[in-house]
UniProtKB/Swiss-Prot annotation:
Protein name per its UniProtKB record: Translation initiation factor 6
Organism of origin: Thermofilum pendens (strain DSM 2475 / Hrk 5)
Annotated family: Belongs to the eIF-6 family.
Annotated SUPFAM superfamilies: Pentein
Stored InterPro entries: eIF6
Organism phylogeny: Archaea, Thermoproteota, Thermoprotei, Thermofilales, Thermofilaceae
Amino acid sequence: MVNVEAISLYGTPNIGVYIFANDRFALIPYDAPEKLDRKIAENLSVDAFRVSVAGTRLVGIFLAGNNNGLVVPRVILDSELEHLKSLLDVNIVVLEDVRETGIGNLVLANDNGCVASQILPKSAVDRIADALGVECIQMSIGDVPFVGSLSVATNRGVALPPLATEEEIKSVEEALKVKANVLTVNRGKMFLRTGLVANSKGALVGEDTTGHEMMQLQRIFFQ
């Protein structure tokens, strides 16, 4: 039985802003409530590690990756980077030459492929592909460049917002080599990553998510 649970964090349903997760671990804010560790263990079946990025809680916005690697922004502090390296046995690449810092908003990846924002320079996309061990394409979704904040991918499926065109859905499926379908969370919100944290084992979703949205989420990732 796959677990999917609706929660809030810091009084908001926008839980994905604060959490990065894959099939091996989760990264959560340094001051997250202890019950979050338990929720992650119960639903995602991984251990949670407490970190900060640029001195903030915004782990989900700043980080992107898959089970092979992690991409971090130039604003990460040296001490934070060393902490990540001590915790994790994955490739970690810092995008020092990229002006944008919300890497989680710009990269959608699983272990089969990667979709990067057209905002990113080709040199950065090549470094991301190397770190994650996959091929990486660049595209927008519904003319919006923030492919990472609009979508959520695992090795079992991809959730895309309703503004994605049929052609874009097909392109994402070909890049990530899993089925994609449309979803909203938190009562119709289309920036899926802000309200959804998923891996191949389960998911956490914002507490405003409706029963219908939960059922669609189950269909996309766990059927």
